[in-house]
């Protein structure tokens, strides 16, 4: 048997234990079930099914049939135990295509959790030839605190009856990731029957719709974490903290954060593929330590801070309440426009855009007088501009450069799709992370191309055209910074083909 592993969490793969099972060719149970139920998911009893046929079933399935026939299957439980699960895109593929960190692949919550050692029955309908699995998401230790795990035990599913065992406590998520343009990327009906796992529920803004429904669902929930699925983000936060921060108006919170992510995606120019080809959510968790962070598959907001970042009025009460989360989500989206030495500022293009869209606070970043001092008094270039404040970078002065481009082209109206074009150009012709000096000049060239204007003097002012001779910088790793006279001349020559700015 040969295994080829093409992706893994954090680009690492390890195997602790692998088990093999023989596929059961015996379909007698399936045939018996289909004599009583209308399909293999066992969600509806045939009109002609007799009590004798029902009683002849294994006890577990007989109980399901009796509950359905007598209409005693609890409607709240049924709404989570019987679901049509929709397909979602492949996060690894689209992270590479769109130059982002990986979004989540936990797009399909079941609302059902298991305890360690539990076995569950999962009844799977027509899979249309697609590959499906169930993943059990529990907790992990991070230093001296716990947080939601990035991944967990995974069990593959086949059409028909599946009996699965789990060794850890956790919430079950249905994994259904495929090419959305495949004609067979269709919803799959799945039934996790009574007696298999414990229903805690979740709130889906598309189907549940109202604050009253949210209040009902979160009050009924029994698991430590409660899931809110919006259009673009999922909250998977401590239930008790959610009830304190958002006792009722969940629509204020989820609509705000769906908008914030939508605005960031708007800058990236990806409306040609989202949501038709890529539809994954960001997945926000509430660690019991640290502060805020962003990584592949999830973003974290410490559980003691949820009150500040959820309800619209609370977010608007202080500039940093919007800035911090927008900054972290910006890390998810910055890769195309980033090179080492700019990692804690290029994402703030998104943060400043969110402040603009919210309409209450002015932008952040140093005044242009700080740029003048850095260039003409301190004789600094881009790579060492200002005074390092975070990760060996003066983020306040650096972030002003991207925002000046936005102000000129978007706010002043000279080219209102400038950033969208620049993102697309840099996805097609990419900055090489290992060569930050060449990366900054490549950014300048593509910015001129996106604007269709010669931006030589703009980037000269920002210190891009100053020679740098093999300087080692440190920012999330060590990098050699080289900006040679040769590549400066080549960049100036390239930009000169475009007309002067208006």
Language-model regions: role of each:
Residues 1-30:
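Aromatic, loop-rich ligand-recognition surfaces of beta-strand-rich domains
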Residues 7, 19, 126, 178, ...:
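A mature extracytoplasmic/lumenal domain signature
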Residues 11-16, 118, 130, 170, ...:
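Residues that flank catalytic or metal-binding motifs in active/ligand-binding sites
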Residues 23-32, 191-227:
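Low-complexity, Pro/Ser/Thr- and charge-rich linker/hinge segments at domain boundaries
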Residues 29-74, 436-502:
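Beta/coil-rich, acidic/histidine-enriched accessory regions frequently appended to metallopeptidases
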Residues 33-202:
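Beta-strand-enriched, solvent-exposed domains that form extended recognition/catalytic surfaces
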Residues 214-410, 416-425:
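Catalytic cores of extracellular degradative/oxidative enzymes
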Residues 374-481:
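Active-site-proximal alpha-helical
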């Amino acid at each position: 048997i040969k295994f080829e592993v093409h992706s893994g969490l954090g680009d690492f793969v390890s195997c602790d234990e692998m088990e093999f099972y023989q596929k059961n060719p015996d379909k007698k149970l399936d045939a018996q079930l289909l004599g009583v139920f209308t399909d293999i998911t066992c969600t509806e009893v045939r009109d002609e099914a007799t009590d004798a046929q029902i009683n002849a079933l294994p006890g577990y399935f007989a109980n399901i049939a009796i509950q359905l026939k007598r209409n005693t299957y609890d409607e709240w439980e049924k709404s989570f135990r019987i679901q049509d699960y929709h397909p979602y895109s492949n996060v690894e593929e689209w992270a590479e295509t769109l130059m982002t960190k990986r979004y989540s692949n936990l797009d399909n919550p079941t609302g059902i959790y298991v305890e360690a050692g539990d076995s569950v029955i999962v009844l799977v309908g027509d899979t249309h030839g697609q590959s499906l699995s169930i993943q059990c998401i529990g907790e992990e230790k991070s230093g001296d605190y716990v947080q939601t795990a990035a991944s967990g035990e995974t069990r593959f599913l086949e059409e028909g009856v599946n009996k699965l065992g789990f060794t850890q406590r956790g919430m079950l998520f249905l994994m259904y990731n495929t090419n959305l343009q495949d004609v067979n990327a269709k919803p799959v009906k799945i039934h996790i029957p009574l007696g298999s796992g414990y229903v805690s529920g979740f709130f889906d803004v598309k189907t549940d719709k109202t604050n009253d429904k949210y209040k009902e669902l979160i009050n009924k929930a029994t698991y430590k974490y409660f899931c809110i699925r919006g259009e673009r983000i999922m909250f998977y936060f401590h239930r008790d903290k959610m009830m304190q921060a958002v006792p009722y108006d969940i629509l204020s919170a989820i609509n705000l954060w769906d908008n914030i992510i939508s605005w960031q995606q708007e800058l990236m120019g990806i409306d040609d593929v989202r949501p038709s080809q890529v539809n994954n959510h960001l997945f926000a968790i509430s660690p019991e330590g640290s502060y805020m962070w962003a990584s592949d598959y999830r973003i974290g907001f410490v559980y003691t801070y949820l009150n500040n970042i959820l309800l619209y009025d609370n977010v608007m009460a202080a500039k940093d309440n919007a800035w911090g989360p927008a900054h972290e989500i910006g890390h998810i989206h910055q890769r195309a426009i980033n090179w080492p030495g700019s990692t804690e500022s290029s994402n703030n293009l998104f943060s400043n855009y969110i402040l603009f869209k919210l309409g209450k606070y002015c932008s952040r970043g140093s005044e242009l007088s700080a740029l003048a001092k850095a260039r003409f008094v301190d004789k600094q270039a881009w790579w060492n501009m200002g005074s390092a404040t975070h990760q060996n970078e003066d983020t306040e002065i650096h972030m002003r450069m991207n925002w000046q481009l936005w102000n000129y082209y978007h706010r002043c109206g000279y080219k209102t799709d400038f950033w969208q074009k620049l993102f697309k150009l840099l996805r097609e012709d990419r900055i090489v992370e290992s060569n930050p000096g060449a990366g900054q000049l490549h950014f300048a060239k593509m910015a001129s191309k996106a604007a269709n204007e010669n931006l030589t003097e703009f980037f000269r002012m920002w210190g891009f055209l100053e020679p740098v001779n093999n300087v080692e910088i440190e920012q999330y790793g060590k990098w050699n910074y080289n900006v040679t006279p040769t590549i400066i001349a080549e960049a100036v020559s390239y930009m000169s083909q475009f007309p002067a700015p208006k």
